[in-house]
UniProtKB/Swiss-Prot annotation:
InterPro entries membership: Ribosomal_eL21, Ribosomal_eL21_arc, Ribosomal_eL21_CS, Ribosomal_eL21_sf, Translation_prot_SH3-like_sf
Name of the protein described by the UniProt record: Large ribosomal subunit protein eL21
Gene name in the database record: rpl21e
Lineage of source species: Archaea, Thermoproteota, Thermoprotei, Sulfolobales, Sulfolobaceae
Annotated region (Disordered), positions in chain: 1-23
Gene3D superfamilies: Ribosomal protein L21
GO (cellular component) term, any one: ribonucleoprotein complex
Species annotation: Saccharolobus islandicus (strain L.S.2.15 / Lassen #1) (Sulfolobus islandicus)
Length: 101
């Protein structure tokens, strides 16, 4: 038997899918232009149409804290289990925690 591959985006079919209404839409400028400050809380909301700066699917929906900036991307500290992880995410995949409603 041949072993099946376990790529970076396995088991993400429903997680990284847009609804038919949103399909083809690029991220809004208001979402791209938001400037986060250190200490701001953000929700990681992956936009599947933007591949650059996309975090792994395990971080989808997690709340993290901005701890810095690297180029256009942000360094976000996320608690995963009992560990503190620092991931690099571009603003297309972030929503501020207060406005996530």
């Amino acid at each position: 038997m041949v072993k099946h591959s376990r790529g970076y985006r396995t088991r993400s079919r429903s997680l990284l899918r847009k609804s038919p209404r949103e399909r083809g839409a690029v991220p809004s400028l208001s979402r791209l232009m938001v400037e986060y400050k250190e200490g701001d809380k953000v929700v990681i909301k992956i936009n599947p149409s933007v591949h650059s700066g996309m975090p792994h699917r395990r971080y989808q929906g997690k709340v993290g804290k901005i701890i810095g900036k690297r180029g256009r991307a942000y360094l976000v500290s996320v608690t995963l289990g009992d560990k503190e992880k620092v991931i690099i995410v571009r603003p297309e995949h972030l929503v501020s925690f207060s406005s996530s409603g």
